[in-house]
Swiss-Prot record:
Keywords: Calcium, Carbohydrate metabolism, Glycosidase, Hydrolase, Metal-binding, Secreted, Signal
Transition state stabilizer (site feature) positions: D417
Family the UniProt entry places it in: Belongs to the glycosyl hydrolase 13 family.
SMART domains hit by this protein: Aamy (SM00642)
Phylogenetic classification of the source organism: Bacteria, Bacillati, Actinomycetota, Actinomycetes, Kitasatosporales
Species the sequence originates in: Streptomyces lividans
Subunit-structure text: Monomer.
Source superkingdom: Bacteria
Catalytic site positions: D312, E346
Primary site of residence: secreted
Enzyme Commission number(s) from the entry: 3.2.1.1
Stated name of the protein: Alpha-amylase
Gene field: amy
């Protein structure tokens, strides 16, 4: 729905505060005089499983249901126009006609790929259509839910779903739901008719009694959540009369269950508190929401025997929610006899430091492996360096917990949001022919199937589907399409178009995927055997690792080559004098030398697998271990590592204790470098003991252990506490030289308040020509004296300034002027003729980096001649893009030659529209 911008209705509130550091996940216990619990024995730690839950799955992701049953006509359950039903098979943004019965009929087709688990896009009842005019779109994707208890009538009934699950189970396939906890359909509106995001710092939540509070202080569920009413929110929520009871369960109809802060800007705080293009963003810090979502999905576990969940928009929900929700769902599933219940989350980031905490702290079993996807595309499609793959796998230790590790990561090459692997191949090599693209596609599949993780086939990729881009352009139906935008899409390995159904089991990619699945099934080490890196070319070329079966001691050498030539590489294996015979991609036989090295040749854009003729030799020397603790005083996610000598196929189990609390198993590392992570609370009291233990176990079952500990030192500068921000209009400082602004000293001066400058509230800088600051006032305050000073303590003006807060809670001041202005001044009009993009690189090197622009750019660029920065500033490079008259969006890509800063197209829009959320 096109958003109409509204002006915020703001209460006058004098109390103003500053946000400090946030609390971490689990508060540690301070050291006591009592004897702390003894560490677990070596034998107990040695029994810790090296693998957990699902590590040998192969997923098939169905977004639009696979088959349209009967003739091309609307489902019988729907009546009305396309804007009422959402059904229009000629429009890619509407329902096309597939349903659960059609998917059930195609189970054998799915099984033929080697599939062990079906992941279905959300099938719960949705709001059929959102938006108007050209912005109208249907909820065919399933992410605009109104009823979390019923199957959407476009897809069928709850009975149809039970039948599908039953038949899939009978064929040996699991079924996973795609679930949402972040938001619901767009039902809640705001009285102000304004949708810009309002931050917590400027507009804190208020209790029913009008006191500001920070909801994050209550998110862990340990404290009673404050009582609130309709006046507690930055935006005043309202629900149309006709929709007051639309949502199911009924608690979802309470507007107080939502954040009510306006539309997300997709960055910073708004990424977790803002509405995604108007979708109602649930207040997941509330215990009612946590408990409500637990009950919703527990019902599906119990009544439908579902095998697991793919969880949408995980990084847009607070971490405390996941810790509680995932723990509760795991416990409930186990209670129902489902010890292998598996949950993986969508954390849309190629940075392992962003994705991994949702496993280690959020307690999910896995995440969708966006870092792998990014590196796999760079290697297989763009001919990038093997070192990028090495870096991704080198971070695998970050996912290790007592119940999970990177072998459970869910790997993929493309999806319903970013686009298909076939699309990326065509984008990365626009002049390439079908044969070359098909070869690169095969290489990408080999990389995904032969490396650690659970691979996902996005429906249609096995038939060579491509597409014009992501989102709607990546959601073609498998049955014959009537959508014009799909009919001209190429399909790799065939001359077929989307005017025909695509269920060809003889298609080249279908046959390749099926063969790779058989290879993994016959050789389980290729699915979840120990993965040890052996070689990574610095540039295009060979990437190699070993996959070793810890039970049989059999080693497999796996090598890939993304170059157009046929190079060779020499690297170590686990055995000296061992013969390795070609198993896949080659008939060659190689033998390792006395130094355990082999030389392997890999054909152009291909992969090979060689299998050892015998077991690894029994270890001669017993293992020894040396443990390395995090630096004293380190907080947050810290690393614990161990050096191991001797043994063979060693694995190291780590455990930690904070204060006098229980010992916790941190997880198992099954190859060097042996590392795990530990979360240390930022508020750990000084003097708290941090104790660590690690046990190494070799292939013969022999063990050795190491222990160490240290005391947490006092924090320099004292402790910080998260404080609530203000609600109301701030003191505004209109400045000609914002960079010179320093702290603002506010409040009635008292002789004993000899504050340091660093403790004064700094000015925040939200927009053009203004900055603002807040400070909490005493109850009953009537006047506020303040100074504006720079970093050296120099005053902005000689005289003290005073605000009469009984008259106003908002004033404007200008540099060098003593006068306070109580009426909002005129601000310079925004320049609508150009877009300004600020780009920052960690290395600070912008040589060769340019901006490719299209869409509403006045002068779209050629890829070979990108727009150059007009200047650099303390943040980074600055690009200025002239826009067309009335411009509403700009598409862009930052790149250096063929190296892209991000793998997918980026876009800016002047106003959000009601397309599906970023999930």
């Amino acid at each position: 729905m096109p958003a109409t911008r509204r002006t915020a209705r703001v209460r006058r509130v004098a109390a103003v505060t500053v946000t400090a550091l946030a609390a971490a996940l689990l508060p540690p216990l301070a050291a006591r005089a009592d004897t702390p619990p003894a560490p677990p024995s070596d034998a107990k730690l040695a029994k810790t499983a090296a693998r957990h839950d699902l590590t040998r799955e192969q997923f098939y992701f169905s977004c639009r249901t696979l088959r349209q049953r009967g003739r091309r006509e609307r489902p019988r359950r729907l009546t009305g126009t396309r804007l009422t039903t959402g059904y229009d098979p000629t429009d890619k943004g509407f329902y096309q006609g597939g349903d659960l019965k059609g998917l059930t009929e195609k189970l054998d087709y799915i099984k033929g790929l080697g599939t062990t688990s079906i992941w279905m896009a959300p099938i719960f009842k949705n709001q059929p259509v959102q938006g108007t005019g050209k912005d109208a779109s249907a909820g065919y994707h399933g992410y605009w839910i109104t009823d979390f208890t019923q199957v959407d009538p476009h897809f069928g009934t709850n009975k149809d779903l039970k039948n599908l699950i039953s038949k899939a189970h009978a064929k040996g396939m699991k079924v996973f739901f795609d679930v949402i906890t972040n938001h619901t359909a767009d039902v809640v509106d705001y009285e102000e008719k304004s949708y810009d995001y309002l931050s917590k710092g400027a507009f804190p939540y208020l209790t029913k009694d009008g006191q500001p509070f920070d909801d994050a202080d209550y998110a862990d569920g340990e404290r009673r959540f404050p009582r609130v009413d309709s006046g507690s929110f930055p935006r005043t929520p309202t629900v149309p009369t006709a929709k007051k009871n639309l949502k199911v369960p009924s608690w979802l109809n309470d507007p107080a269950m939502y954040h009510n802060r306006g539309d997300s800007t997709w960055a910073g705080e708004s990424a977790t508190y803002g509405d995604f293009n108007g979708l109602d963003d649930l207040w997941t810090e509330r215990p009612e929401v946590v408990g409500g979502m637990e009950k919703i999905y527990q019902r599906w576990v119990e009544d439908f025997a579902i095998d697991g969940f793919r969880i949408d928009t995980v990084k847009h929900v607070d971490m405390e929610f996941w810790t509680q929700w995932a723990t509760a769902l795991d416990a409930y599933a186990a209670k129902k006899g489902r010890d292998d219940f598996f949950m993986f989350g969508e954390v849309y980031s190629a940075d392992t430091s962003v994705t991994a905490p949702y496993v280690t702290q959020g307690r999910l079993d896995s995440t969708l492996d966006f870092p792998f996807q990014d590196a796999a595309r760079a290697y297989a499609s763009q001919g990038g360096s093997a070192r990028k793959l090495a870096a991704v796998f080198g971070d695998d230790y970050k996912y290790t917990t007592d119940k999970a590790n990177a072998y459970e990561q869910v790997t993929f090459l493309g999806n319903h949001d970013m686009g298909r692997i076939g699309t990326f191949l065509k984008q990365d090599a626009p002049e390439a022919g079908d044969a070359e693209l098909l070869k690169k596609d095969r290489l990408a599949n080999e990389l995904m199937f032969l490396s650690r993780g659970n691979p996902v086939i996005y429906y249609g990729d096995e038939q060579g589907f491509t597409g014009a881009g992501g989102d709607k352009d990546a959601r073609q139906p498998m049955f014959a399409s009537r959508t014009a935008d799909y009919l001209d899409d190429d399909q790799l390995g065939t001359d077929r178009t989307h005017a025909e159904a695509a269920y060809d089991t003889s298609a080249p990619l279908y046959r390749q995927i099926s063969a790779l699945a058989e290879l993994r099934k016959a050789n389980p080490a290729l699915a979840d055997g120990v993965q040890t890196e052996r070689y990574a070319a610095d540039g295009a070329g060979i990437y190699a690792f070993s996959r070793t079966d810890a039970k049989t001691g059999t080693e497999y050498v796996v090598a890939f080559n993304n170059a157009g030539t046929e190079p060779s590489a020499a690297f170590a294996t686990g055995s000296a004098g061992m013969t390795f015979r070609g198993l896949y991609g080659t008939d060659a036989t190689v033998k390792s030398g006395a130094d355990s090295k082999v030389t392997v040749t890999v054909p152009a854009r291909s992969a090979v697998v060689l299998k050892a003729a015998g077991r690894l030799a029994a270890p001669a020397a017993e293992p020894t271990i040396s443990l390395h603790a995090p630096d004293p005083g380190a907080t947050g996610t810290v690393e614990l590592s161990a050096d191991v000598a001797g043994g063979q196929l060693n694995r190291v189990v780590f455990a930690a204790q904070t204060g006098d609390g229980k010992w916790r198993t941190l997880g198992t590392a099954d190859h060097a470098p042996y590392k795990v992570t530990h979360t240390v609370d930022a508020d750990t009291p000084a003097g708290t003991a941090l104790r660590y233990k690690a046990v190494v176990v070799d292939s013969a079952g022999r063990t050795a252990s190491g222990r160490l500990h240290h005391r947490h030192p006092a924090r320099r500068g004292g402790a910080h506490r998260r404080l609530p921000g203000p609600r109301g209009r701030p003191l505004q400082a209109r400045r000609r030289e914002l960079r010179r602004l320093g702290p603002v000293r506010l409040g009635r001066p008292r002789r004993r308040e000899a504050h340091h400058l660093a403790r004064h509230p700094p000015l925040h800088r939200p927009g053009r020509l203004r900055a603002f600051a807040y400070v909490k006032l005493k109850p009953g305050a009537s006047t506020v004296g303040f100074l504006v000073i720079d970093k050296d303590g120099n005053k902005d003006v000689a005289a003290d300034r005073t605000i009469d807060v009984t008259e106003t809670g908002e004033v404007w001041i200008e540099q060098g002027e003593e006068q306070l202005v109580t009426e909002r001044p005129e601000y310079p009009a925004q320049d609508t003729t150009k877009a300004v993009l600020h780009y920052k690189r960690a290395d600070g090197n912008y040589d060769g980096w340019g901006l490719h622009v299209w869409g509403d750019a006045a002068n779209p660029t050629d890829w070979a001649k990108p727009l150059q920065p007009v200047r650099t500033d303390p943040y980074g490079a600055v690009f200025e893009v002239p826009l067309t008259d009335g411009a509403s969006s700009l598409s862009y890509m930052v790149h250096k030659g063929d190296e892209k800063d991000l793998p997918t197209d980026q876009a800016w829009t002047s106003r959000p529209t009601a397309t599906r959320c970023g999930c």
